[in-house]
Amino acid sequence: YDFIICRNRDYLNWRYFRHPFYKYKVIVALKNERILGYIVFREEKEAKTGYILDILGDLNYPHHIYFLVVKALRYFKKKEVENVCCSLTHKKYISVFRKIGFYPYEKTDCLIRFKDTQLQNVFFRRKNWHLTLGDGDFQGMK
């Protein structure tokens, strides 16, 4: 990806495992001790809502992504979660989520002006991006 937040150990620990307000669940897909992908999620019990905050895997093997999402959905089902939200930018991720039953809910318009047309060409290709709910601070504070 041309646009992705560095998802190394330090960042993931800071973002999810040392969060002062929320407890996150993580599932990792491994093969021979090699990480093939991961998913980060949490539930909001009062709202009976689940959030998939981060998912990353090799897009050449979408079945790993599928497996991770299905495992998270099984967890949510056990917790009687009624709605699951996520935000994705890449078509291959969106395709996997749609196969599982997710659908687009809301679109927003964003207006941007570029001085550098080279940057504009890269910026508007969604395949260049990997953004998820976990990349923002939408959740606020408890």
Would you name each region that the model predicts?
Residues 1-53:
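Amide-forming acyltransferase catalytic core, primarily the GNAT-like/NAT-type
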Residues 15, 31, 42-63, 67-142:
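Active-site/acyl-donor-binding loops of N-acyltransferases
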